[in-house]
Amino acid sequence: MTNIRKSHPLIKIINHSFIDLPAPSNISAWWNFGSLLGVCLILQILTGLFLAMHYTSDTMTAFSSVTHICRDVNYGWIIRYMHANGASMFFICLYMHVGRGMYYGSYTFSETWNIGILLLFTVMATAFMGYVLPWGQMSFWGATVITNLLSAIPYIGTNLVEWIWGGFSVDKATLTRFFAFHFILPFIISALAAVHLLFLHETGSNNPSGITSDSDKIPFHPYYTIKDILGILALTLTLMLLVLFSPDLLGDPDNYIPANPLSTPPHIKPEWYFLFAYAILRSIPNKLGGVLALVLSILILAIIPLLHTSKQRGMTFRPLSQCLFWLLVADLLTLTWIGGQPVEHPFITIGQLASILYFLTPLVLMPISGIIENRLLKW
């Protein structure tokens, strides 16, 4: 068996990636989120496949087909809610994974980091299109508002929006193409994830100390496989508690009302995992400025490696940078809360201040703290 594992052309790749892979001996539970994201992706593809067998991407029947899945299909309700809440778990793991990369300086692996940013954008696009498919009020108006933002692009904006819509408003053509893209994108994400791993295994994993661990490696199996299984069990428990006890906790009640172009909901808002970006978009009174800020709120991750001024890699031994990192986390939570609130005083002001702080912390304060810490250590 050992010979096949090490000599078979296909099994050999799996062996070098998940069994005999040399891994640092000191990586913490924060390194579990990569495998959890893989599990989430597989879960989403499988549940999505079964949903696609019963879903119809037509404006007249989309809402009814989702109701039919929940009421008439065997265990359709659990498949639907695992898919909806699985997306929330996916984003929790995704944000934790990105946060860990920022905290421990994993962004110095530039290829892995950049592929990761591309993955983040792709997952966000997939989730947005998936939210449109049930064709409830929030699906329809969310699609209308977010796609309409592209009209802020000079010269080509209006034509671009109508091209994406497939007409003069969000309608049957829009729903059909969103379903097609929502179906194909997870497979593209899988391919990108494989490239992400390929680049990671070129350099090897980072570790909490931030220094090279070449002198102290251990095999991935059994040490980290068992550790990953514990993480998967925790993820499964959390997901099933959510699905079985409060499946609609993270959803919007308005999405149980069929889409009606003649009636606008009082508060249009996306799913909770996009609220921070939505709050940044709303905090800028100018449409084009808001769209640019929205894109930059994610693209800022690509700038972070260029602004790394510290001579240490991670923040493990940098208390000043740690304070700023947790300030950024608190700011993100504030933005998430603001994104779900109506556009009125005092939420507008809080949102604007939180948006300024969101860009100020990684672009200005963190590089300065890196320089100060170098000076304090006489480097």
Curated annotation (Swiss-Prot):
Compartments (UniProt record): Mitochondrion inner membrane
Binding site for heme b b566: H97, H196
Sequence positions that bind heme b b562: H83, H182
The keyword NADP appears for this protein: no
GO cellular component: mitochondrial inner membrane; respiratory chain complex III
Pfam families the record matches: Cytochrom_B_C (PF00032), Cytochrome_B (PF00033)
Family in the record: Belongs to the cytochrome b family.
Name used for this protein in its record: Cytochrome b
Gene: MT-CYB
